[in-house]
From Swiss-Prot:
Protein name per its UniProtKB record: Calcitonin gene-related peptide type 1 receptor
Statement: the UniProt record of this protein carries the keyword Magnesium: no
A GO CC annotation given for this chain: plasma membrane
Pfam families assigned: 7tm_2, HRM
Transmembrane segments: 141-165, 177-199, 211-239, 254-274, 291-315, 331-352, 368-388
Residues of the signal peptide: 1-22
Topology feature Cytoplasmic, residues: 166-176, 240-253, 316-330, 389-462
Purpose of the protein: G protein-coupled receptor which specificity is determined by its interaction with receptor-activity-modifying proteins (RAMPs). Together with RAMP1, form the receptor complex for calcitonin-gene-related peptides CALCA/CGRP1 and CALCB/CGRP2. Together with RAMP2 or RAMP3, function as receptor complexes for adrenomedullin (ADM and ADM2). Ligand binding causes a conformation change that triggers signaling via guanine nucleotide-binding proteins (G proteins) and modulates the activity of downstream effectors. Activates cAMP-dependent pathway.
Site (described: Required for RAMP2 interaction): 289
Site (Required for ADM interaction): 203, 374
Membrane topology: Multi-pass membrane protein
Amino acid sequence: MEKKFFLSFLFLLPFFMILVIAESEEENPDDLIQLGVTRNKIMTAQYECYQKIMQDPVQQTEGIYCNRTWDGWLCWNDVAAGTESMQHCPDYFQDFDPSEKVTKICDQDGNWFRHPASNRTWTNYTQCNVNTHEKVKTALNLFYLTIIGHVLSIASLLISLGIFFYFKSLSCQRITLHKNLFFSFVCNSVITIIHLTAVANNQALVATNPVSCKVSQFIHLYLMGCNYFWMLCEGIYLHTLVVVAVFAEKQHLMWYYFLGWGFPLIPACIHAVARRLYYNDNCWISSDTQLLYIIHGPICAALLVNLFFLLNIVRVLITKLKVTHQAESNLYMKAVRATLILVPLLGIEFVLIPWRPEGKIAEEIYDYIINILMHYQGLLVSTIFCFFNGEVQAILRRNWNQYKIQFGNNFSHSDTLRSASYTVSTISDGTGYSHDCLSEHLNGKSIHDTDNVVIKPEKLYD
């Protein structure tokens, strides 16, 4: 026990000395926080390494080998002579890429490689930051691409919601589901922008790991679940309408509200409790944990169930069309087609995530594709469910035509008034007749009756 304490004290002493010196200097508070986090990580790794060195059994294999060691940043196991050991770069520093590799060579004599310039044992960390500049540039591009995607999504979704709320003739249960789906995407885009700009992009905040950023991540994951479960509600509604209720019109929407807004709370809460117990760090942002399957699992299940419902709906509708050729079946087929297009598009990123390719260019292309698929979903949903919707297009076209006719009639009415005024002034100057003569120029009607001449726009569509 005394030996362990002495070793720990001996190797931690330089870090405490550095800490005292650093505290005497004036530095940026954020830099001090990041520096403190880096020191804590190194000290923790060092302590765990020496614990491992003392507790692991002695090498029993025959032959020459290099002894286990701590190189200052990473811990290395016993390695056979003439081989190269490799592990991932540490995440101590912002310019280190944990996906890159660190190498350490054990020579033929069973000694760790020494650098010729210093004649000291040396570990090759050069690959950890060799591509940092390019990766930072790519990360910034992806960041701006994400923000643009969510801004466009919010704008298109709000326009769509405005259309649905303004035109009362569009009100029906399916449009109500659309409204909830759109609202969930708006909320998700807003919280994502806040989360990316205020939390994920603030290394000092992530390092301190406050409760506020964990709440932000919790809301973000909850709303992401709401997006997919409202898509499931769309599929269930159509399935009930077409397959179960045989074209019945009314359904109870309470269960849809529970599924769309209530059920995603369950995996979000379970994930929060698990992260609090096992991975309570980095504002719960780190993705190198299997706990994310608590969120992604139900989402994938919802996508699969939705796909099954939609395929079954298509089967039933095709059968009905062959037998009855009902126009109503054609209308349902159009609604199903829109949902059937969206389901694979909204879920394809969960299929692609495990298949990340190898290679710099391939990884960059993959990142851009995943980024677009994930962060432009709101724009895609509003485009397919609203802007490409035949009913919406028809009512917008009809109202636009009414506006043009009304504007044209108002313009003609203004010209009529100007013409009448000119005629009155001419007659007054020439003959001195009363203004009642104006009625002849208005086909026997007075000025106040001219509104009755205007064609009523709504009559055009009776």
